[in-house]
């Protein structure tokens, strides 16, 4: 089972724990947990992609979403995958800190979410990237509210580098 949204993937990987006391769902939930992988995790480990060179090498700042790095324990795989495009993939300073999205956190705790966003954007912009990449839709929305630097889902970049349209 492949997930291209880190929050959903984290939840599916946690089904075994969530349903551990449910006699009807326990075994099925455990199977789902064991089969679930983030799409970047799977692609990095299982496929040799044929990347097409571009006229320019880009600087990509990779934001590891909380649900990805803390929930799924997937951190280096998306960056390794992006590095195969022959671009410069940069880890954001203080990358372990939330961007302020956190599901509904940016709606329920707007002041703190804005402070986290400002800190994240400052750290991103210190790298002077051509664009930002992440695997979480909420983070894409949150970070795009604080910067003019384009932010793309990791799979959008990989699609472009395997012959798809420029995002």
Language-model segments: residues:
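Iron-sulfur cluster-binding electron-transfer modules in prokaryotic oxidoreductases
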Residues: 1-167
């Amino acid at each position: 089972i492949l997930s291209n949204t880190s929050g959903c993937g984290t939840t599916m990987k946690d089904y075994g724990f969530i349903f551990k006391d449910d006699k009807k769902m326990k075994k099925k939930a455990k199977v789902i947990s064991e089969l679930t992988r983030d799409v970047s995790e799977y692609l990095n480990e299982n496929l040799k992609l044929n990347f097409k060179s571009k006229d320019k090498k880009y600087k990509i700042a990779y934001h590891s979403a909380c649900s990805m790095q803390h929930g799924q324990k997937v951190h280096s795989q998306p960056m390794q995958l992006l590095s195969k495009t022959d671009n410069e993939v940069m880890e954001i300073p203080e990358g372990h800190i939330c961007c302020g999205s956190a599901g509904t956190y940016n709606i329920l705790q707007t002041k703190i979410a804005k402070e986290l966003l400002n800190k994240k954007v400052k750290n991103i912009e210190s790298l002077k990237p051509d664009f930002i990449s992440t695997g979480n839709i909420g983070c894409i929305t949150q970070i795009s509210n604080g910067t003019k630097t384009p932010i793309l889902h990791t799979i959008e970049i990989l699609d472009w580098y395997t012959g798809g349209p420029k995002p």
